């Protein structure tokens, strides 16, 4: 946003998008507005975005199916988090986009195929339901 004039963009109309783990980051960028996360340069600029388009995002890292704690330790969601999500479900939930949804969330366009073999379709349905509920 600090370079908006240079790139001729409107810094008040910033959207983010990403696929899979990038979809997770898209959701977190759009939903987690904790000021403690604002570090580095350009702190005078807001990190808030005005739109999000996640593609097949993991949205509740505590809800992924795992057969055992041993198998879950090497799962994509545990590797993303840096800890075994099955052994610490509350921490996994708090690290998930679904725990960050508020009435102030920007507009979302969620794209997800219902035959996805990696990220269950219900992950997007859950986020969509929470976004709709908070907007009412």
Which residues make up each language-model segment?
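Alpha/beta-hydrolase superfamily serine-hydrolase fold, recognizing
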Residues: 1-136
């Amino acid at each position: 946003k600090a370079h908006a004039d240079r790139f001729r963009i409107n810094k008040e109309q910033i959207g983010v998008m990403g696929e899979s783990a990038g979809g997770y980051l898209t959701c977190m960028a759009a939903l987690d507005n904790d000021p403690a996360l604002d570090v580095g340069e350009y702190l005078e600029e807001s990190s808030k975005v005005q739109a999000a388009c996640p593609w097949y995002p993991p949205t509740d890292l505590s809800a992924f199916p795992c057969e055992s704690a041993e198998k879950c330790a090497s799962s994509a969601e545990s590797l993303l988090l840096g800890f075994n999500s099955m052994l610490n479900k509350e921490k996994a939930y708090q690290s998930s986009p679904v725990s960050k949804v508020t009435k102030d969330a920007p507009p979302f366009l969620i794209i997800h195929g219902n035959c996805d073999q990696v990220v269950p379709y219900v992950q997007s349905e859950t986020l969509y339901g929470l976004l709709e509920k908070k907007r009412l």
